[in-house]
Amino acid sequence: WKGFTLPGGHVERGESIVDAVIREMKEETGLTISNPKLCGVKQFPIDNGRYIVFLFTADKYTGELISSDEGTMHWVDKDELSSVNTVSDLNELLQVMLDDNLSEFQYVIEDGEWKMILK
């Protein structure tokens, strides 16, 4: 992916989800985050199941932002997001992450078409 997206990754065997968030942030950004908070879930159907993404926020960190094998890292102000190339559903992801009345971002397939639902 050549545009802007959020850091992400996977949970390793035996690792807690929170520990995976802390590890992935360190690996991808160079930042050590404290007290990540689960703020939403994104899910979509795959072959015989579904893929689930846990969305976290963290407001405390130490370290300096660095680039990694994942790409060049930059801070982007929320007001500037509309002027940069982002993943197509970044606005909806941020909406779920920042709106206390939302907790789920779901893709469903209806009549052969992908549909986005925010709950």
Residue ranges and their predicted role:
Residues D99-K119:
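C-terminal regulatory/oligomerization modules of transcriptional regulators
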Residues W1-K26, G112-K119:
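Conserved Nudix-box catalytic region and its N-terminal flanking loop in Nudix hydrolases
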Residues L6, I33, G49-V53:
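Short connector loops at helix/strand junctions that flank enzyme active sites
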Residues I66-M97, K115-K119:
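NUDIX/MutT-family hydrolases
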Residues T5, L55, W75:
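Short aromatic/basic micro-patch
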Residues F44-E64, N91-M97, N101:
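Active-site-adjacent beta-strand/loop module that shapes the phosphate/pyrophosphate-binding cleft
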Residues T32-G40:
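A short coil-to-beta-strand element that immediately follows conserved catalytic motifs
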